[in-house]
């Protein structure tokens, strides 16, 4: 088996691609039980990584401030709203 990249080191895109591969393998149903359990655990970690990255991106977008013309002028702390 190849060495797996730690989930916490993955970009959103890489984690999403691997999550799709894991789901495909599990849906095919041709994986041994022990391997299925490992895949499921890996998939759960990948899902959490993707959710965390999406939340972080949403927070950045929510913090963008606009001027009177609707142009971005910077960011503000999330709790300043």
Swiss-Prot record:
Top-tier EC class: hydrolase
Subcellular location: Cytoplasm
Cytoplasm listed as a keyword: yes
Keyword Nuclease attached: yes
Cited Pfam families: Exonuc_VII_S
GO MF term set: exodeoxyribonuclease VII activity
Keyword annotations: Cytoplasm, Exonuclease, Hydrolase, Nuclease
Main location: cytoplasm
Catalytic reaction equation(s): Exonucleolytic cleavage in either 5'- to 3'- or 3'- to 5'-direction to yield nucleoside 5'-phosphates
InterPro entries per the UniProt record, alphabetical: Exonuc_VII_S (IPR003761), Exonuc_VII_ssu_sf (IPR037004)
Coiled-coil stretches noted in the UniProt entry, renumbered to this chain: none
GO biological process, one term: DNA catabolic process
Enzyme Commission designation: 3.1.11.6
Any GO CC annotation of this UniProt entry: cytosol
Family classification: Belongs to the XseB family.
Function: Bidirectionally degrades single-stranded DNA into large acid-insoluble oligonucleotides, which are then degraded further into small acid-soluble oligonucleotides.
Assembly and oligomerization: Heterooligomer composed of large and small subunits.
Protein name as annotated: Exodeoxyribonuclease 7 small subunit
Organism lineage: Bacteria, Pseudomonadati, Pseudomonadota, Alphaproteobacteria, Rhodobacterales
Gene: xseB
């Amino acid at each position: 088996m190849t060495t797996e990249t730690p989930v916490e080191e993955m970009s959103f895109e890489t984690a999403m691609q691997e999550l799709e591969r894991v789901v495909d393998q599990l849906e095919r149903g041709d994986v041994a039980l022990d391997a299925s359990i490992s895949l499921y655990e890996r998939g759960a970690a990948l899902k959490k990584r993707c959710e965390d990255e999406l939340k972080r991106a949403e927070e950045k977008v929510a913090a963008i401030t606009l001027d009177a013309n609707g142009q971005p002028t910077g960011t503000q702390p999330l709790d300043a709203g």
